[in-house]
Amino acid sequence: MYHRHSAPPPPGWSGGYPPRQQQWPPPQPYEYPPYPPQGPPPAHTFPPPAHRDYPSPYPTPPPHSPSPYQHPHHGHSQSWSVPAVPPRPPLEAQQFGNGAPSHYRFQYSACTGRRRALLIGINYIGQPNQLRGCINDVTNMSTFLHERYGYRREDMVILTDDQKNPLSIPTKANILRAMQWLVKDAQPNDSLFLHFSGHGGRTPDLDGDEEDGYDDVIYPVDYRVAGHIVDDEMHNIMVRPLRPGVRLTVIFDSCHSGTALDLPYVYSTQGILKEPNLAKEAAQDLFSAISSYGKGDLSGVAMTAIGFLKKAAKGDSARQRTVMTKTSPADVVMFSGSKDTQTSADTFQDGEARGALSWAFIKSLKQWPNQSYLQLLNSIRAQLDGKYTQKPQLSCSHPLDVNLLFVM
Protein backbone atom coordinates (compact mmCIF):
# COMPACT_ATOMS: atom_id res chain seq x y z
CA MET A 1 0.00 0.00 0.00
CA TYR A 2 1.35 3.40 -0.94
CA HIS A 3 0.83 5.76 1.92
CA ARG A 4 3.62 8.30 1.50
CA HIS A 5 3.33 12.08 1.55
CA SER A 6 5.86 13.95 -0.57
CA ALA A 7 5.30 17.26 1.24
CA PRO A 8 3.76 16.72 4.67
CA PRO A 9 1.87 19.63 6.21
CA PRO A 10 3.63 21.62 8.92
CA PRO A 11 3.18 20.53 12.56
CA GLY A 12 -0.13 21.56 14.01
CA TRP A 13 -1.72 22.23 10.61
CA SER A 14 -5.29 20.95 10.72
CA GLY A 15 -6.43 21.95 7.24
CA GLY A 16 -8.60 24.91 8.17
CA TYR A 17 -10.44 23.34 11.10
CA PRO A 18 -10.46 24.75 14.66
CA PRO A 19 -7.37 24.00 16.81
CA ARG A 20 -7.04 20.31 17.59
CA GLN A 21 -8.15 20.61 21.21
CA GLN A 22 -11.36 22.29 20.03
CA GLN A 23 -12.22 19.90 17.25
CA TRP A 24 -14.31 17.28 18.97
CA PRO A 25 -17.09 17.61 19.68
CA PRO A 26 -17.44 20.80 17.60
CA PRO A 27 -20.15 23.28 18.63
CA GLN A 28 -20.84 24.21 15.00
CA PRO A 29 -18.25 23.04 12.47
CA TYR A 30 -17.81 25.37 9.48
CA GLU A 31 -20.03 27.97 11.25
CA TYR A 32 -23.33 26.63 9.98
CA PRO A 33 -25.87 24.12 11.30
CA PRO A 34 -24.85 20.48 10.98
CA TYR A 35 -26.04 18.56 7.97
CA PRO A 36 -29.06 16.33 8.70
CA PRO A 37 -28.15 12.80 9.80
CA GLN A 38 -27.65 10.42 6.91
CA GLY A 39 -29.96 7.46 6.55
CA PRO A 40 -29.13 4.11 5.05
CA PRO A 41 -27.95 4.07 1.44
CA PRO A 42 -30.59 3.85 -1.29
CA ALA A 43 -31.30 0.50 -2.82
CA HIS A 44 -29.25 1.26 -5.93
CA THR A 45 -26.06 2.04 -3.98
CA PHE A 46 -23.37 -0.41 -4.96
CA PRO A 47 -19.69 -0.88 -4.20
CA PRO A 48 -17.39 0.74 -6.75
CA PRO A 49 -15.58 -1.72 -8.99
CA ALA A 50 -11.89 -2.33 -8.55
CA HIS A 51 -10.87 0.27 -11.09
CA ARG A 52 -7.89 2.64 -11.13
CA ASP A 53 -5.47 -0.29 -11.09
CA TYR A 54 -1.86 0.45 -11.86
CA PRO A 55 -0.73 0.04 -15.46
CA SER A 56 2.27 -2.16 -16.04
CA PRO A 57 4.90 -0.99 -16.58
CA TYR A 58 4.36 2.31 -14.81
CA PRO A 59 4.08 5.16 -17.29
CA THR A 60 6.44 8.09 -17.61
CA PRO A 61 5.43 11.67 -18.39
CA PRO A 62 4.67 12.41 -22.04
CA PRO A 63 7.64 13.65 -24.11
CA HIS A 64 8.18 17.37 -24.35
CA SER A 65 7.19 19.15 -27.54
CA PRO A 66 10.05 20.87 -29.46
CA SER A 67 9.27 24.26 -27.94
CA PRO A 68 8.02 24.90 -24.38
CA TYR A 69 4.51 24.16 -25.53
CA GLN A 70 3.07 24.49 -28.98
CA HIS A 71 -0.50 25.58 -29.45
CA PRO A 72 -2.44 26.45 -32.59
CA HIS A 73 -3.23 30.05 -33.39
CA HIS A 74 -6.78 31.06 -32.50
CA GLY A 75 -9.06 30.57 -35.45
CA HIS A 76 -8.80 27.96 -38.17
CA SER A 77 -5.16 28.14 -39.20
CA GLN A 78 -3.36 24.81 -39.21
CA SER A 79 0.05 26.34 -38.42
CA TRP A 80 1.52 25.90 -34.95
CA SER A 81 3.53 28.36 -32.87
CA VAL A 82 4.11 29.45 -29.29
CA PRO A 83 1.32 31.93 -28.51
CA ALA A 84 1.40 35.11 -26.51
CA VAL A 85 -0.15 35.07 -23.05
CA PRO A 86 -3.93 34.68 -23.56
CA PRO A 87 -6.18 37.62 -22.64
CA ARG A 88 -7.58 37.79 -19.12
CA PRO A 89 -11.33 37.30 -18.59
CA PRO A 90 -13.54 40.38 -19.08
CA LEU A 91 -15.00 41.94 -15.95
CA GLU A 92 -18.38 43.02 -17.30
CA ALA A 93 -21.48 40.80 -17.27
CA GLN A 94 -21.85 38.42 -20.24
CA GLN A 95 -24.90 37.05 -22.04
CA PHE A 96 -25.51 33.32 -21.96
CA GLY A 97 -26.99 32.53 -25.35
CA ASN A 98 -26.65 28.85 -26.34
CA GLY A 99 -30.27 28.05 -25.52
CA ALA A 100 -30.43 29.70 -22.10
CA PRO A 101 -33.16 32.27 -21.34
CA SER A 102 -32.44 35.58 -23.09
CA HIS A 103 -32.27 37.60 -19.87
CA TYR A 104 -29.62 35.37 -18.25
CA ARG A 105 -26.23 36.92 -17.53
CA PHE A 106 -23.04 35.53 -16.04
CA GLN A 107 -19.79 37.06 -14.87
CA TYR A 108 -16.22 35.79 -15.05
CA SER A 109 -14.16 36.01 -11.86
CA ALA A 110 -10.94 38.01 -11.67
CA CYS A 111 -9.85 35.66 -8.84
CA THR A 112 -8.47 38.58 -6.84
CA GLY A 113 -10.55 38.07 -3.68
CA ARG A 114 -10.55 35.53 -0.87
CA ARG A 115 -9.25 32.02 -1.57
CA ARG A 116 -10.63 28.86 -0.01
CA ALA A 117 -10.05 25.18 -0.87
CA LEU A 118 -11.61 21.81 -0.03
CA LEU A 119 -9.37 18.81 -0.80
CA ILE A 120 -10.75 15.26 -0.45
CA GLY A 121 -8.58 12.16 -0.90
CA ILE A 122 -9.91 8.68 -0.11
CA ASN A 123 -7.78 5.55 -0.39
CA TYR A 124 -10.52 3.40 1.23
CA ILE A 125 -7.91 1.95 3.57
CA GLY A 126 -8.67 -1.65 4.53
CA GLN A 127 -11.61 -1.93 2.12
CA PRO A 128 -11.75 -4.40 -0.80
CA ASN A 129 -11.33 -1.78 -3.54
CA GLN A 130 -8.49 0.14 -1.89
CA LEU A 131 -6.70 2.85 -3.89
CA ARG A 132 -3.13 4.02 -3.41
CA GLY A 133 -2.70 7.51 -4.81
CA CYS A 134 -5.61 9.61 -3.56
CA ILE A 135 -4.13 10.87 -0.29
CA ASN A 136 -0.91 11.72 -2.12
CA ASP A 137 -3.00 13.67 -4.64
CA VAL A 138 -4.42 15.86 -1.89
CA THR A 139 -1.01 16.45 -0.30
CA ASN A 140 0.50 17.48 -3.61
CA MET A 141 -2.48 19.62 -4.59
CA SER A 142 -2.43 21.52 -1.30
CA THR A 143 1.27 22.31 -1.73
CA PHE A 144 0.70 23.38 -5.34
CA LEU A 145 -2.19 25.68 -4.43
CA HIS A 146 -0.19 27.24 -1.59
CA GLU A 147 3.02 27.78 -3.53
CA ARG A 148 1.68 28.70 -6.97
CA TYR A 149 -1.68 30.36 -6.31
CA GLY A 150 -1.36 31.79 -2.81
CA TYR A 151 -3.97 29.67 -1.03
CA ARG A 152 -3.27 29.89 2.69
CA ARG A 153 -3.01 26.67 4.68
CA GLU A 154 -5.56 27.94 7.18
CA ASP A 155 -8.07 28.43 4.34
CA MET A 156 -7.89 24.79 3.26
CA VAL A 157 -10.00 21.92 4.59
CA ILE A 158 -8.34 18.53 4.10
CA LEU A 159 -10.40 15.33 4.33
CA THR A 160 -8.43 12.07 4.06
CA ASP A 161 -9.01 8.64 5.53
CA ASP A 162 -5.62 8.39 7.25
CA GLN A 163 -6.35 11.08 9.85
CA LYS A 164 -7.09 10.65 13.55
CA ASN A 165 -9.44 13.61 13.96
CA PRO A 166 -13.06 12.46 13.32
CA LEU A 167 -13.88 15.78 11.59
CA SER A 168 -11.12 15.20 9.05
CA ILE A 169 -12.32 11.77 7.90
CA PRO A 170 -14.10 11.92 4.49
CA THR A 171 -17.43 10.49 5.64
CA LYS A 172 -20.56 11.48 3.76
CA ALA A 173 -21.65 13.86 6.52
CA ASN A 174 -18.22 15.51 6.74
CA ILE A 175 -17.96 15.91 2.96
CA LEU A 176 -21.38 17.52 2.67
CA ARG A 177 -20.65 19.89 5.56
CA ALA A 178 -17.30 20.81 4.04
CA MET A 179 -18.92 21.53 0.66
CA GLN A 180 -21.29 23.94 2.38
CA TRP A 181 -18.35 25.57 4.17
CA LEU A 182 -16.51 26.00 0.87
CA VAL A 183 -19.16 28.23 -0.73
CA LYS A 184 -20.51 29.95 2.40
CA ASP A 185 -20.54 33.78 2.08
CA ALA A 186 -18.55 33.73 -1.18
CA GLN A 187 -18.25 37.15 -2.83
CA PRO A 188 -17.57 38.24 -6.45
CA ASN A 189 -13.93 37.62 -7.48
CA ASP A 190 -13.39 35.07 -4.70
CA SER A 191 -11.58 31.93 -5.87
CA LEU A 192 -12.84 28.62 -4.46
CA PHE A 193 -11.25 25.25 -5.24
CA LEU A 194 -12.58 21.69 -4.87
CA HIS A 195 -10.44 18.60 -5.43
CA PHE A 196 -11.81 15.06 -5.12
CA SER A 197 -9.63 12.00 -5.62
CA GLY A 198 -11.31 8.66 -5.01
CA HIS A 199 -13.92 6.25 -6.31
CA GLY A 200 -16.73 7.43 -8.55
CA GLY A 201 -19.64 5.63 -10.17
CA ARG A 202 -23.07 5.92 -11.74
CA THR A 203 -26.63 5.43 -10.56
CA PRO A 204 -29.98 5.59 -12.44
CA ASP A 205 -31.12 9.17 -13.02
CA LEU A 206 -34.39 9.98 -11.24
CA ASP A 207 -35.05 13.57 -12.34
CA GLY A 208 -34.57 13.36 -16.11
CA ASP A 209 -31.58 15.72 -16.40
CA GLU A 210 -29.07 13.19 -17.72
CA GLU A 211 -28.83 12.35 -21.42
CA ASP A 212 -27.52 8.85 -20.74
CA GLY A 213 -30.07 8.10 -18.01
CA TYR A 214 -27.49 7.96 -15.21
CA ASP A 215 -26.32 10.36 -12.51
CA ASP A 216 -22.64 10.54 -11.57
CA VAL A 217 -21.81 9.80 -7.94
CA ILE A 218 -18.79 9.89 -5.64
CA TYR A 219 -18.17 7.42 -2.82
CA PRO A 220 -17.36 8.67 0.69
CA VAL A 221 -15.27 6.41 2.88
CA ASP A 222 -18.45 5.23 4.66
CA TYR A 223 -20.49 4.66 1.50
CA ARG A 224 -21.45 1.13 2.57
CA VAL A 225 -23.40 2.60 5.48
CA ALA A 226 -24.24 6.17 4.46
CA GLY A 227 -24.50 5.76 0.68
CA HIS A 228 -22.98 7.75 -2.15
CA ILE A 229 -23.26 11.46 -3.03
CA VAL A 230 -25.10 12.25 -6.27
CA ASP A 231 -24.12 14.98 -8.75
CA ASP A 232 -27.50 16.73 -8.35
CA GLU A 233 -26.87 17.17 -4.62
CA MET A 234 -23.35 18.50 -5.14
CA HIS A 235 -24.65 20.96 -7.73
CA ASN A 236 -27.35 22.20 -5.39
CA ILE A 237 -24.85 22.71 -2.55
CA MET A 238 -21.90 24.23 -4.39
CA VAL A 239 -23.11 25.74 -7.68
CA ARG A 240 -26.66 26.97 -7.21
CA PRO A 241 -25.93 29.36 -4.26
CA LEU A 242 -22.98 31.14 -5.92
CA ARG A 243 -23.22 34.81 -6.87
CA PRO A 244 -22.07 36.25 -10.22
CA GLY A 245 -18.30 36.60 -10.40
CA VAL A 246 -17.48 33.88 -7.86
CA ARG A 247 -15.01 31.32 -9.22
CA LEU A 248 -15.25 27.67 -8.27
CA THR A 249 -12.54 25.52 -9.85
CA VAL A 250 -13.19 21.78 -9.56
CA ILE A 251 -10.93 18.78 -10.15
CA PHE A 252 -12.69 15.39 -10.05
CA ASP A 253 -10.10 12.62 -10.31
CA SER A 254 -12.50 9.69 -10.27
CA CYS A 255 -14.25 7.29 -12.60
CA HIS A 256 -17.40 8.33 -14.47
CA SER A 257 -16.79 11.97 -13.53
CA GLY A 258 -17.44 13.75 -16.83
CA THR A 259 -20.49 15.65 -15.56
CA ALA A 260 -19.99 15.15 -11.81
CA LEU A 261 -21.30 18.66 -11.05
CA ASP A 262 -23.97 18.69 -13.77
CA LEU A 263 -22.39 21.67 -15.54
CA PRO A 264 -24.25 22.08 -18.84
CA TYR A 265 -21.47 23.39 -21.13
CA VAL A 266 -18.90 20.75 -22.13
CA TYR A 267 -16.07 21.57 -24.55
CA SER A 268 -14.06 19.50 -26.99
CA THR A 269 -10.30 19.72 -27.50
CA GLN A 270 -11.03 22.04 -30.45
CA GLY A 271 -12.88 24.42 -28.16
CA ILE A 272 -16.26 23.49 -29.63
CA LEU A 273 -19.31 23.26 -27.40
CA LYS A 274 -20.35 19.62 -27.45
CA GLU A 275 -23.90 18.71 -28.41
CA PRO A 276 -25.25 15.21 -27.90
CA ASN A 277 -25.21 13.09 -31.04
CA LEU A 278 -27.95 10.61 -30.21
CA ALA A 279 -27.73 8.79 -33.53
CA LYS A 280 -24.03 8.07 -33.01
CA GLU A 281 -24.54 7.10 -29.37
CA ALA A 282 -27.45 4.83 -30.27
CA ALA A 283 -25.29 3.07 -32.85
CA GLN A 284 -22.55 2.59 -30.25
CA ASP A 285 -25.12 1.19 -27.83
CA LEU A 286 -26.36 -1.26 -30.45
CA PHE A 287 -22.79 -2.44 -31.13
CA SER A 288 -22.19 -2.82 -27.38
CA ALA A 289 -25.37 -4.86 -27.01
CA ILE A 290 -24.32 -7.19 -29.83
CA SER A 291 -20.83 -7.57 -28.30
CA SER A 292 -22.30 -8.33 -24.86
CA TYR A 293 -24.62 -10.94 -26.33
CA GLY A 294 -21.72 -12.57 -28.16
CA LYS A 295 -19.79 -12.82 -24.89
CA GLY A 296 -22.79 -14.25 -23.04
CA ASP A 297 -23.09 -11.10 -20.91
CA LEU A 298 -26.88 -10.92 -20.66
CA SER A 299 -26.77 -8.25 -17.96
CA GLY A 300 -24.70 -6.11 -20.30
CA VAL A 301 -27.31 -6.58 -23.01
CA ALA A 302 -30.07 -5.49 -20.64
CA MET A 303 -28.24 -2.41 -19.37
CA THR A 304 -27.30 -1.35 -22.89
CA ALA A 305 -30.85 -1.81 -24.14
CA ILE A 306 -32.21 0.28 -21.28
CA GLY A 307 -29.69 3.01 -22.03
CA PHE A 308 -30.57 2.94 -25.73
CA LEU A 309 -34.29 3.33 -25.04
CA LYS A 310 -33.74 6.15 -22.56
CA LYS A 311 -31.53 8.07 -24.97
CA ALA A 312 -34.00 7.65 -27.80
CA ALA A 313 -36.93 8.74 -25.63
CA LYS A 314 -35.55 11.72 -23.74
CA GLY A 315 -32.05 12.63 -24.90
CA ASP A 316 -32.95 16.00 -26.40
CA SER A 317 -35.26 16.93 -23.54
CA ALA A 318 -32.57 16.03 -20.97
CA ARG A 319 -30.10 18.32 -22.71
CA GLN A 320 -32.55 21.23 -22.68
CA ARG A 321 -33.50 20.54 -19.07
CA THR A 322 -29.85 20.61 -18.01
CA VAL A 323 -29.11 23.86 -19.85
CA MET A 324 -32.23 25.59 -18.56
CA THR A 325 -31.91 24.47 -14.94
CA LYS A 326 -28.18 23.95 -14.25
CA THR A 327 -26.72 27.18 -15.64
CA SER A 328 -25.25 29.63 -13.14
CA PRO A 329 -24.30 33.33 -13.14
CA ALA A 330 -21.16 32.30 -11.23
CA ASP A 331 -17.88 31.21 -12.85
CA VAL A 332 -17.71 27.44 -12.25
CA VAL A 333 -15.09 25.49 -14.22
CA MET A 334 -14.42 21.76 -13.87
CA PHE A 335 -11.74 19.42 -15.16
CA SER A 336 -12.79 15.79 -14.73
CA GLY A 337 -10.67 12.68 -15.07
CA SER A 338 -12.79 10.88 -17.63
CA LYS A 339 -16.00 10.82 -19.59
CA ASP A 340 -19.15 9.68 -17.82
CA THR A 341 -18.69 6.21 -19.32
CA GLN A 342 -14.96 5.85 -18.58
CA THR A 343 -12.80 4.83 -15.63
CA SER A 344 -9.83 6.83 -14.31
CA ALA A 345 -6.37 5.47 -13.55
CA ASP A 346 -3.75 5.63 -10.84
CA THR A 347 -0.20 6.27 -11.99
CA PHE A 348 3.22 6.18 -10.37
CA GLN A 349 5.22 9.41 -10.59
CA ASP A 350 8.11 10.93 -8.64
CA GLY A 351 8.38 7.87 -6.44
CA GLU A 352 4.77 7.71 -5.28
CA ALA A 353 1.27 6.67 -6.32
CA ARG A 354 -0.78 9.45 -7.92
CA GLY A 355 -4.12 9.93 -9.66
CA ALA A 356 -3.53 10.48 -13.37
CA LEU A 357 -5.60 13.68 -13.68
CA SER A 358 -4.29 15.22 -10.46
CA TRP A 359 -0.72 14.61 -11.59
CA ALA A 360 -1.31 15.90 -15.13
CA PHE A 361 -3.13 19.06 -13.94
CA ILE A 362 -0.28 20.07 -11.62
CA LYS A 363 2.46 19.13 -14.08
CA SER A 364 0.85 21.06 -16.95
CA LEU A 365 0.45 24.27 -14.96
CA LYS A 366 3.95 24.03 -13.50
CA GLN A 367 5.45 23.69 -16.97
CA TRP A 368 3.20 26.21 -18.73
CA PRO A 369 1.56 28.55 -16.19
CA ASN A 370 0.03 30.99 -18.71
CA GLN A 371 -2.32 28.78 -20.70
CA SER A 372 -5.82 29.32 -21.99
CA TYR A 373 -8.57 26.95 -20.89
CA LEU A 374 -8.34 25.14 -24.21
CA GLN A 375 -4.55 24.87 -24.05
CA LEU A 376 -4.76 23.51 -20.52
CA LEU A 377 -7.29 20.86 -21.53
CA ASN A 378 -5.05 19.78 -24.39
CA SER A 379 -1.85 19.82 -22.34
CA ILE A 380 -3.51 17.68 -19.65
CA ARG A 381 -4.61 15.22 -22.31
CA ALA A 382 -1.11 15.27 -23.84
CA GLN A 383 0.37 14.19 -20.50
CA LEU A 384 -1.89 11.12 -20.52
CA ASP A 385 -1.99 10.41 -24.25
CA GLY A 386 -0.96 6.90 -25.22
CA LYS A 387 -0.86 5.68 -21.64
CA TYR A 388 -4.53 5.66 -20.60
CA THR A 389 -7.87 5.35 -22.34
CA GLN A 390 -9.45 8.04 -20.16
CA LYS A 391 -10.14 11.44 -21.73
CA PRO A 392 -10.20 14.36 -19.27
CA GLN A 393 -13.16 16.68 -19.77
CA LEU A 394 -13.67 20.46 -19.49
CA SER A 395 -17.11 21.74 -18.47
CA CYS A 396 -18.50 25.04 -17.25
CA SER A 397 -21.60 26.58 -15.69
CA HIS A 398 -21.82 29.14 -18.52
CA PRO A 399 -20.66 29.47 -22.14
CA LEU A 400 -16.87 29.67 -21.85
CA ASP A 401 -14.47 31.57 -24.10
CA VAL A 402 -11.88 28.80 -24.07
CA ASN A 403 -9.17 31.12 -25.47
CA LEU A 404 -9.13 33.26 -22.32
CA LEU A 405 -6.31 32.90 -19.79
CA PHE A 406 -6.93 30.19 -17.19
CA VAL A 407 -6.99 31.95 -13.82
CA MET A 408 -7.59 30.58 -10.37
From Swiss-Prot:
InterPro entries: Caspase-like_dom_sf, Metacaspase, Pept_C14_caspase. The keyword Hydrolase applies. The keyword Aminoacyl-tRNA synthetase does not apply. Residues 24-49, 56-66 have a biased composition (Pro residues). One of its GO terms (cellular component) is cytoplasm. Involved in cell death (apoptosis). Required for the apoptotic-like loss of membrane phospholipid asymmetry at stationary phase and facilitates growth under conditions of endoplasmic reticulum stress. This is Metacaspase-1B. It comes from Aspergillus fumigatus (strain ATCC MYA-4609 / CBS 101355 / FGSC A1100 / Af293) (Neosartorya fumigata).
